[in-house]
Amino acid sequence: MLPNTGKLAGCTLFITGASRGIGKAIALKAARDGANVVIAAKTAEAHPKLPGTIYTAASEIEAAGGKALPCIVDVRDENQISAAVEKAVDTFGGIDILVNNASAISLTNTLETPMKKVDLMMGINTRGTYLTSKICIPYLKKSKVAHILNLSPPLNLNPIWFKNHCAYTIAKYGMSMCALGMSEEYKGEIAVNALWPKTAIHTAAMDMLGGSGVDKQCRTPDIMADAAYAILSKPKDFTGNFVIDEELLKHEGIKDLDVYAVSPGHPLLPDFFLDESPEALASAMEEHGATAAFKAGKAQAKSQDSSPLQETFKAIESLVNEEAVKTTQGIYQFVLSGEESGNWFLDLKNGKGGVGSGEPSTKADVVMSMDSGDFIKMFTGKMKPTMAFMSGKLKIKGDMGLALKLEKILGQMNAKL
């Protein structure tokens, strides 16, 4: 890992969303230099599903050698940001570094994204980044080491990154456009850069998006913290860059990136928005055994009258039980196209559960549309739902929470198939 050099000693960092995940990891890295850290986040009380609060983060920062100022901040609220900035200046004498880390995500298509979610993503990602930067800039201009770092991707305009989650991409690219514009506007005064991971990072958000077992395909937030530290240690003339964590750390002399892996040696899940298309990424992962997290299905005896799809559903049916119903409580409908088109359902909500062709007797909680061939691959462990969704091969309507449970269900089924 990248060693601390002390370059951030005495610097004051204002980090949004720093109560957990990547934001907290960056805060702890800076704290080891003896930096002051303003934890600007919403979580003041423990969340039932998400770890950490601004106060637990503050304790960790101080234990690491830094000084912490926890502030309750919703980056959509101008008054809360202004109050936190003023408190930071009063406490530490100024602000040297702003890290715009707070973000919201919904990987849903246009018709399936309620305007409430659109407003949330635009408000936190784009507007929140712009607003927090605007309020901090007068103080940053007084610093000799002024930096703004946005955790956002390169501006890749390949339509593949828009078609499945247009609202999220627009909101995330808004953060990147802030970096692009402000780096030129404040050249010579404030360094402004963007940082994005090459691979998935294991955070609470990734657990929610990727489902059970996704952690093995991720790196820890430490890789982003080390990359951020490298950027923030550079002079002001390092500005206007869209940095990828892995590439920067290799340039900094880090040769063993496996130290950042949650499960060293396991194939990694590529992140969104990078040059390679999702389809190519999915193929590359399969070539390198990325589906090894789920055991390949054992050969099933096929009758001459049964199609591969029918055999797949027979295998699924043999594994449906009351325990699966109890833990899932959802009805899945599969709208399949291609060689074996038609509707099928998986009932993991009623009685002992059930599988069948056609539509379920009660309304499905989740409707999944895909090619029948890809469906067979997904249910026999040869394709992960996460990659199917990322590559556009799987369309989802309905309860996304239940959709995310499918990966865990498949893992359990594939272990027995």
UniProtKB/Swiss-Prot annotation:
It comes from the Eukaryota. InterPro entries: HSDL2, NAD(P)-bd_dom_sf, SCP2_sterol-bd_dom, SCP2_sterol-bd_dom_sf, SDR_fam. Keywords: Mitochondrion, NADP, Oxidoreductase, Peroxisome. The active site is at Y168 (proton acceptor). CDD domains: HSDL2_SDR_c. GO terms for molecular function: oxidoreductase activity. Residues 306-414 form the SCP2 domain. Its main location: other. It is found in: Peroxisome; Mitochondrion. NADP(+) binds at G17, A18, S19, R20, G21, I22, G23, K42, D74, K172. Its EC number is 1.-.-.-. One of its GO terms (cellular component) is peroxisome. Belongs to the short-chain dehydrogenases/reductases (SDR) family. NCBIfam families: PRK08278.1 (NF006133). Has apparently no steroid dehydrogenase activity. Might act as a metabolic regulator that affects systemic adaptation to nutritional cues. This is Hydroxysteroid dehydrogenase-like protein 2. It comes from Xenopus tropicalis (Western clawed frog).
